[in-house]
Structures are given as structure tokens and as C-alpha cells.
Amino acid sequence: MSKVYDWFNDRLEIQGIADDITSKYVPPHVNIFYCIGGITFTCFIMQVASGFAMTFYYRPTVTEAFASVQYIMTDVNFGWLIRSIHKWSASMMVLTMILHVFRVYLTGGFKKPRELTWVTGVILAVCTVSFGVTGYSLPWDQVGYWAVKIVTGVPDAIPVIGAPLVELLRGGVGVGQSTLTRFYSLHTFVLPLLTAVFMLAHFLMIRKQGISGPL
């Protein structure tokens, strides 16, 4: 086994990478509140895993979406557990994201030279809220339908571009199959990809600049 490890280590310098990760200096002022960002990331991983599992059974059509969710909850082995994990980790992700933003703001973690880290964090916060908005509609029940209708109707108040923006979000004049397809694509592909990219940038900047000092 050691020969296999040595072979990879000679080519990839695994030991050096491991030493760098495990020997990073942690300032003495760091407390449990500095772990909230990591909890948010953990919730995201749970979302990805449970959401991926549900894509095998969910059908993104206005006629079958609700029935497919019921099927997941009642007929799929541990489907109720997977969807419950997805639901509660989503709520936890939003909560911990808000707490993380407050912690960073109150401790001055947004100040020079960490402005870009703050910017990527704000973008991730927007992605998190967008996950909630798009995911809420996917069961396509009465609550989801009317939530989509209200949310997509908000831009209509914007002068000039309001109406075209509403039509772009809905995929037409009214809320229907095109709307559900758009929200499903955003929820399962676009937003996870954007979140992963900005999380990577966020983590790399934290790794490079370290944890901000005390007030």
C-alpha cells in the first residue's frame, strides 16, 4: 500500500498538500460562530446529494410534478427521508447563511483586503435565496403555483423592461409548463453550478487571506 501512496506522492505531492491543509494557522480569537459558514456549506452538500436522489423520480411537468412528489414520499424506499432531509437542510442553509452574514459584518470581515470575499459571499447569499424561490415551485401544488405567480409578477412594476422581464421569467404571458421548466433548470443546473463556482472562489480567497482578525 505504501508503494502505491509513494507513486502518487512523487507525482502529485500529496503529502505537501495534506501538510498545508492540516497545518494552517487558526487565530486564537476564533470561536464557534466562525464555524457557521462551514455549516452552511455542509447544508449545501446535503442539498446536492438529496436533490440528486430525487431527480430519479421527480417529473417536471405541470400534470405529473405533484404526483411524482407524492410517489417519492409514499412509494420510494426512504423517499420520505430523502425529501425531508432536502427540505430541512434547505431551511437550515438559509438560517445559517443569514447568521454567517451577520457574523462577518459584525466582526468586520468585509474590510480590506477581503472585499472580494465579501462580494462572492453576497452572490452566494443571492443564490441561496434563489434556490428557495425556485425549489418552492417544483411540487407544483397550490402554494407553489401561487408563489411563482406572485414572485414572477414582481418585476412587472419596473418601467419599460418590467413586462418583458416577467415574460422571460415565466416563459410566456402566463404561468405554466414553460415556467416550471425554467425553474427546474435553474434549481437543478444553473444555480448549483454558479454556487459551486463562487464557493470555490470564496474558499480560495479565505485560504489565501486567512481568517480576519478580532475587532
Curated annotation (Swiss-Prot):
Free-text cofactor note: Binds 2 heme b groups non-covalently with two histidine residues as axial ligands. Binds one heme group covalently by a single cysteine link with no axial amino acid ligand. This heme was named heme ci.
One GO MF term: oxidoreductase activity
InterPro entries: Cyt_b/b6_N, Cyt_B6_PetB, Cytb/b6-like_sf, Cytochrome_b_N_euk/bac, Di-haem_cyt_TM
Spans traversing the lipid bilayer: 32-52, 90-110, 116-136, 186-206
Membrane topology term: Multi-pass membrane protein
Binding site for heme b 2: H86, H187
Family matches, as SUPFAM superfamilies: Transmembrane di-heme cytochromes
PROSITE patterns: CYTB_NTER (PS51002)
Compartments where found: Plastid, Chloroplast thylakoid membrane
Binding site residues for heme c: C35
CDD domains in UniProt: Cytochrome_b_N
GO biological process, alphabetically ordered: photosynthesis; respiratory electron transport chain
Swiss-Prot/TrEMBL cofactor(s): heme b; heme c
Keywords assigned: Chloroplast, Electron transport, Heme, Iron, Membrane, Metal-binding, Photosynthesis, Plastid, Thylakoid, Transmembrane, Transmembrane helix, Transport
Positions annotated to bind heme b 1: H100, H202
Alphabetized Pfam families for the sequence: Cytochrome_B (PF00033)
Assembly mode: The 4 large subunits of the cytochrome b6-f complex are cytochrome b6, subunit IV (17 kDa polypeptide, PetD), cytochrome f and the Rieske protein, while the 4 small subunits are PetG, PetL, PetM and PetN. The complex functions as a dimer.
Misc. comment: Heme 1 (or BH or b566) is high-potential and absorbs at about 566 nm, and heme 2 (or BL or b562) is low-potential and absorbs at about 562 nm.
Family the entry assigns: Belongs to the cytochrome b family. PetB subfamily.
Family matches, as NCBIfam families: PRK03735.1
Function statement: Component of the cytochrome b6-f complex, which mediates electron transfer between photosystem II (PSII) and photosystem I (PSI), cyclic electron flow around PSI, and state transitions.
Protein's recorded name: Cytochrome b6
Species whose genome carries this gene: Mesostigma viride
Annotated gene: petB
